Design a protein with these regions (language model features):
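Surface-exposed loop/turn motifs in large extracellular/passenger domains
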Residues: 1-385
């Protein structure tokens, strides 16, 4: 489709859509336009393709707006609903070089499977755009599968943002209760498939975003389960910032568990942060974190490059943390590559921190391989063992 303004109205697809090719969508394969409105429409069936596969659109640019009674539902008339492909697979859009907004509640309840890389419950790959999560609703039984770059909402965010404009975290007086935050994704993220079951060897696995490159993540909340093998986090598996101007703030994990039984870099909020520039703060973990090496209540591992001074501020861990090497209540392991003057401030751990193997352990930081840096105005109230 190539036009200035387009609409899909009162449309339902209940038959399977299968292709060995790329750009496969429940409604549209490729959309190139300024505006598209999808109103009172549903995709309720099985969808399979190769690269760029989405329940609504395979590959999209422009502005996509969803309104009315629209949904991607788990079952229609006894049918089986699953969105599957090899790469860039999303519950709604596979490859999104577009904005996607929901005027009314838009419900997604389907399995999403990438057999090679990049799967998201809403978008497989988000490219250079901002996704605002207002009015997107995901079922608690939803499961997103894939071996790499897998997120409950977005598999991979490249030079973009994933935000909720209304969410914020205030830590000025007391720690807010977990129930005061509304979850954006309550389901499960893991490797494996619906046919062979879940597995625990996936990389860059996150409750909201799998892998974020030069992207902001602001004001989001996760309440489900994440299982992976390396770079595993309650909000995001891996963040890599190469440019200035990005933020990771006001994010909450209140999920059941973040688990990594084999590899490294496991965090209640983020598995691995590669920092050169940006703002990091106001992050809370309430969930259980169970990892191997480099395990932390908020961050598993942080690597500081040669850019700005890094400040980690207002981090709170209120979930039990267990690991086998370099385990911390807030951060498991920091490495600096010659960076100096970095700091952790105004942070606190309230829960037990357990090291089941060798290496270091700390109430705030497990191990810091970083020169002339400091921790101040922070406290540990948990049992360290």
């Amino acid at each position: 489709t190539n036009s200035s303004t387009s609409q899909i109205i009162n449309t339902q697809v209940a038959a399977p859509v299968r292709s060995d090719g790329n750009c496969v969508g429940g409604f549209i394969g490729v959309y190139r336009s300024n505006n598209l409105t999808i109103s009172n429409s549903q995709f309720n069936s099985y969808l399979k393709g190769n690269v760029s596969v989405g329940g609504l659109i395979g590959d999209a640019t422009g502005e996509i707006k969803v309104e009315g009674n629209s949904q991607i539902a788990e079952v229609y008339n006894g049918g089986y609903n699953s969105i599957e492909g090899n790469e860039s697979v999303g519950g709604a859009i596979g490859l999104a070089k577009c904005t996607l907004t929901a005027k009314d509640e838009f419900t997604i309840n389907t399995q999403v499977v990438a057999y090679r890389t990049t799967a998201g419950g809403l978008i497989g790959r988000l490219d250079a755009k901002t996704l605002t999560l207002a009015n997107f609703t995901f079922d608690q039984n939803m499961h997103v599968y894939g071996p790499d770059a897998v997120g409950g909402v977005v598999g991979q965010a490249m030079n973009g943002s994933v935000i909720d404009g209304k969410a914020s975290v205030s830590l000025d007086n007391s720690i807010p209760k977990a129930d005061s935050f509304t979850s954006h994704f309550p389901g499960t993220v893991s490797s494996g498939s619906p046919y062979g079951g879940s597995s625990s060897n996936g990389t860059a696995m996150g409750g909201i975003v799998g892998y974020a490159y030069s992207s902001s993540i602001i004001g989001v909340c996760f309440s489900g389960t994440v299982v992976g093998g390396e770079r595993v986090g309650g909000i995001v598996g891996q963040i890599q910032w190469a440019d200035a101007g990005y933020s990771f703030k006001n994010c909450i994990n209140k999920g059941k568990s973040v688990t990594n039984s084999s590899g490294s870099m496991t965090g209640g909020v983020c598995g691995f942060l590669q920092y050169d520039h940006g703002y990091v703060g106001n992050l809370i973990n309430y969930g259980k974190v169970d990892g191997s090496s480099a395990t932390g209540g908020v961050f598993g591992q942080v690597k500081v490059g040669g850019g700005d001074k890094m400040v980690l501020t207002y981090m709170v861990n209120a979930g039990d943390v267990a690991g086998k090497d370099n385990v911390g209540g807030c951060v498991g392991f920091i490495t600096g590559n010659g960076s100096t003057g970095n700091e952790i401030n105004n942070s606190v751990n309230f829960s037990s921190v357990t090291n089941n193997g060798g290496g270091s352990i700390g109430g705030i930081l497990g191990y810091g391989d970083i020169a002339k840096s400091c921790i101040f105005s922070s406290a540990n109230h948990g049992n360290i063992k």
